[in-house]
């Protein structure tokens, strides 16, 4: 009988048997997998216990949240219904190319460090270092923001309870979920995401029926698309601003790369999740924006006033109320709470795994690379929780510090997306340069090299367009707050580069080797697929005989 250790795979940044190579990137050496004996005890690692449905819902749930339920109204108000649709469609396409780029690498090299590890191996270790720490910091701060937001949402029902009580309770709950086996995290995230998906589906059904007049009175149809300056208002700057809001709404989809390191069958689950998630997200966002724009004119002040503290004027709430759902505010408040809880849960998972991967790459203290018997990186989880807790305290006792921390993490998601595009471009070129064939890749990104290059250009435009108004009036304080993530990222990159004397890795020296652990996971996935095909064939033959 196989032991628990035998059934698990090492999916850290530096995989089993990997030793640091000159230049800072890892070179994997063959380390046989054997049963534990007195002379050979495998080190504990995170475990591959996430199923395909978990991976799909984690990515889907990570991108359907308050950005859709609350902030979507702002894009319609500022750019008009047409501008909002263009922004979300363009960002959706950009995200699709990023996801296919990440998917190609993640199915070939499924590691917990994801894009940070890939940047270290395919581009420059300094890039991976900066991306990893930036991403960890972003999600640690986001956990603090989400716990604060959740307390505001909960006060809708319990106005007498102090905010800090709810915040600490939510932070403790998130910690408990993440300290259990990764399967518990996956199940929790699956059901939280399912609540959001069902809400959007109900909203679309009720909204479309209202648009054509079956419920809610007279049919508005497309009158709001020709109202005053609609469908486009504010010109190109307004549309570019809508790009920024839409971009923040889609952030979280890159979590699919981190889950690859703990997926039971990454070569099957990652491609399937990418296909499902892209179309669902794009349709959910585009149709939701369309319904809101049809039912609420872009001039409505309610579109600008929606926030977590006043869910009664969320675009979703207004549409439900127009259709005659009296309890709309309470229902949407519950949905927003699940969204915030889901975001905090995903954020804790992502930041913990990134810190663990950085330690495996020897880019963080080694203690953060330790895991318990269940494959949970407890030191990394404790460190992340501590940072989130301190950030939360700063929101109570030092508002300026809290504002600085939030601003410092503001553009990290976009920086990660840009890094994914660069890493994939380098990976594919190195793969072919070193004599490999595309047929060796179990999943290939679409429209290479056009796809990742277009996505990179769009991502840079979105970063630049975050706060054009402040450039117009030369508001240096606002510019500094908005773009603070960029210089901090550059400081991390340059500091590591100069200290370790790293260079851009030549294509013919890029490390494309797969450790025995990765090959074993690939073989197991292939065997499972073959067994499923044989089982299906036997069933068909049996049916034919009958």
What is the meaning of each model-derived region?
Residues 192, 368-378, 417-481, 503, ...:
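C-terminal membrane-solvent junction of multi-pass transporters and transport-like membrane proteins
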Residues 46-47, 57, 68-166, 481-485:
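Extracellular loop-to-transmembrane helix junctions
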Residues 116-121, 147-167, 199, 257-268, ...:
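Helix-loop-helix connectors at the membrane interface of multi-pass transporters/channels
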Residues 111, 134-148, 245-263, 326-366, ...:
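Membrane-helix boundary/coupling elements in multi-pass transport proteins
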Residues 1-73, 77-82, 96, 100, ...:
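Membrane-interface "cap" regions at the ends of multi-pass membrane proteins
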């Amino acid at each position: 009988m196989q032991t628990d250790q035998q059934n698990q795979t090492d999916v850290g940044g530096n995989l089993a048997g990997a030793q640091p190579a000159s230049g800072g990137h890892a070179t994997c050496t063959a380390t046989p997998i054997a049963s534990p004996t007195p002379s050979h005890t495998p080190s504990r690692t995170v475990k591959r216990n996430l199923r395909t449905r978990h991976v799909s819902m984690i990515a889907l749930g990570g991108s359907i949240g308050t950005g859709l339920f609350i902030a979507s109204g702002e894009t319609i108000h500022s750019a008009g219904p047409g501008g909002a649709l263009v922004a979300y469609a363009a960002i959706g396409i950009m995200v699709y190319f990023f996801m296919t780029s990440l998917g190609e690498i993640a199915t070939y090299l499924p590691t917990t460090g994801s894009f940070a590890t890939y940047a270290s191996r395919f581009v420059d270790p300094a890039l991976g270092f900066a991306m990893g720490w930036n991403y960890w910091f972003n999600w640690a701060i986001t956990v603090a923001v989400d716990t604060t937001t959740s307390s505001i949402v909960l006060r809708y029902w319990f106005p007498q309870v102090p905010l800090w009580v709810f915040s600490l309770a939510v932070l403790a709950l998130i910690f408990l979920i993440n300290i259990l086996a990764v399967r518990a995290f996956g199940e929790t995230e699956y059901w939280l995401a399912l609540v959001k998906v069902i809400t959007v589906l109900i909203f679309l059904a009720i909204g479309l029926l209202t648009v054509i007049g079956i419920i809610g009175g007279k049919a508005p149809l497309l009158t709001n698309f020709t109202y005053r300056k609609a469908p486009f208002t504010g010109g190109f700057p307004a549309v570019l601003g809508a790009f920024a809001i839409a971009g923040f709404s889609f952030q979280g989809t890159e979590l699919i790369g981190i889950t690859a390191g703990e997926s039971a069958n990454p070569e099957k689950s990652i491609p399937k999740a990418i296909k499902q998630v892209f179309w669902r997200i794009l349709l959910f966002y585009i149709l939701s924006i369309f319904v809101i724009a049809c039912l609420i004119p872009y001039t409505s002040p309610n579109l600008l006033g929606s926030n977590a503290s006043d869910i009664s004027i969320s675009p979703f709430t207004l549409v439900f109320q127009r259709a005659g759902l009296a309890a709309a505010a309470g229902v949407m408040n519950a949905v927003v709470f699940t969204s915030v809880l889901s975001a905090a849960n995903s954020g804790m998972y992502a930041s913990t795994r990134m810190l663990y991967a950085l330690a495996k790459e020897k880019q963080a203290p080694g203690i953060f690379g330790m895991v318990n018997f269940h494959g949970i990186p407890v030191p990394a989880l404790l460190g992340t929780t501590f940072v989130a807790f301190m950030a939360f305290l700063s929101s109570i006792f030092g508002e300026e510090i809290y504002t600085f921390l939030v601003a410092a993490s503001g553009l990290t998601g976009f920086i990660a997306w840009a890094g994914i595009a660069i890493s994939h471009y380098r990976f594919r070129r190195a793969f072919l340069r070193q004599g490999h064939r595309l047929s060796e890749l179990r999943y290939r990104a679409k429209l290479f090299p056009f796809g990742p290059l277009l996505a990179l250009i769009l991502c840079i435009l979105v970063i630049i367009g975050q706060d054009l108004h402040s450039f117009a009036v030369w508001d240096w304080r606002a510019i500094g707050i908005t773009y603070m993530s960029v210089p901090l990222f550059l400081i991390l990159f340059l500091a590591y580069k100069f200290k370790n004397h790293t260079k851009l890795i030549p294509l013919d020296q890029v490390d494309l080797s797969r450790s025995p652990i990765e090959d074993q996971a690939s073989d197991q996935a292939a065997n499972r697929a073959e067994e499923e095909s044989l089982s299906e064939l036997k069933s068909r033959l049996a049916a034919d005989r009958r």
